[in-house]
Amino acid sequence: MEGGNWRPSIFIEAMPLTIILKRRVPGLSERALERFAARACRAVGIEAAVTVLITGSREMRALNSHFLRKNHATDVLSFPAPAFTNGFAGDIAISLDIAARNARLMRHSVSDEIRILTLHGILHLAGYDHESDRGEMAQIELTLRKTLGLPAALIERASGKRQSRSGPLERSRI
């Protein structure tokens, strides 16, 4: 896919989304996050089931340690299913603790930060990888962030295009 040719898809049908809120997100209901995730999935052409887990840093550390052998918490992890196995695109896990800290540093709401991390995770489930794609994921994330009315996205922050005035952000270690 050429970075300059990407446009959000117009896929309309509903796909199953599972939202698991182990922690309550201020200003964001389960239903609102489900609607947002569905819009983001449609925009990148995901027509398969997705699960989004909102949890704490302790569980994120355990997931990161178990699956990636990294013994620290992180803000978002994505676990794509191979080739959308059985109509399932994959899982996304988000740390509410780290999201809240980064939201304070970036001076936007925790609910916006959760949406940013959800979008980032969905892009990974769609097969994008900012570590190796020469900026394609960053461009798509920027376009979708603007389309969806979100503040600076993860890759923009990590690349230094927008810095926090309060110090370093905890970056995604996907």
Question: Residues of each region from the PLM?
Answer:
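An acidic/histidine-cluster motif and surrounding catalytic segment
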Residues: 2-114, 123-174
